[in-house]
């Protein structure tokens, strides 16, 4: 069973991202503030769930969360910042939305959005460049340890999958509905046949290894 909090009595938002490894598409991050003590045994690290399970849990998270936000950082911005900075920037964008700030490229909701705010951040991973004034704790494998991070991982993953399906319709032939932009043989073959799109991350060294420029 996942833990409901790190510090009892403190409002903690879970933060996670999806899309650090793909060759194409955005990185998407989510921040979720769950009701204190909320527990749902179905919630888990999104990577351990099937696509159907993730899609079923997304509206559950959105409905039960006091507040949630999902932020998107484009491939172009990833190339400018590098993927680590882009990922943590996306998390901070989502957190700022929970704090009531107006942030572009963010969708947010929750029945307490704007009326309650996080006091502490639980961040999946081991590195975080904090752009907020909130204290935080990085937690390796946090999406398999804490309920709020697991909820954030589900939102980040499902929103990014949606984005890749839309991009697949715009640029058919790369199989993005299936591979979600990750470095599969199908994706490499498509790049060699069709070239790069505006949604490809040109900074990723995998391209150079395949002499695609």
List each model region and its residues:
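RNase H-like, Mg2+-dependent phosphodiesterase core
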Residues: 1-213
């Amino acid at each position: 069973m996942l833990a409901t909090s790190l510090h009892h009595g403190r409002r903690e938002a879970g933060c996670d991202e999806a899309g650090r490894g793909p060759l194409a598409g955005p990185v998407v991050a989510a921040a979720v503030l769950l009701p204190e003590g909320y527990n749902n045994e179905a919630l888990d690290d999104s990577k351990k769930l099937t696509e159907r399970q993730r899609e079923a849990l997304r509206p559950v998270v959105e409905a039960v969360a006091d507040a949630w936000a999902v932020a998107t950082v484009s491939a172009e911005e990833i190339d400018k910042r590098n993927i680590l900075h882009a990922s943590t920037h996306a998390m901070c964008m989502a957190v700022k939305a929970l704090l009531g700030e107006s942030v572009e490229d963010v969708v947010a909701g929750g029945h307490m959005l704007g009326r309650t705010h996080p006091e502490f951040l639980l961040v999946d991973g081991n590195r975080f460049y904090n752009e907020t004034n909130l204290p935080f704790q990085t937690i390796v494998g946090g999406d398999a340890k804490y309920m709020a991070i697991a909820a954030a991982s589900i939102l980040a993953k499902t929103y990014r999958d949606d984005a890749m399906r839309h991009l697949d319709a715009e640029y058919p032939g790369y199989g993005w509905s299936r591979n979600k932009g990750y470095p599969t043989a199908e994706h490499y073959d498509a790049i060699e046949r069709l070239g790069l799109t505006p949604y490809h991350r040109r900074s990723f060294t995998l391209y150079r290894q395949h002499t695609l420029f």
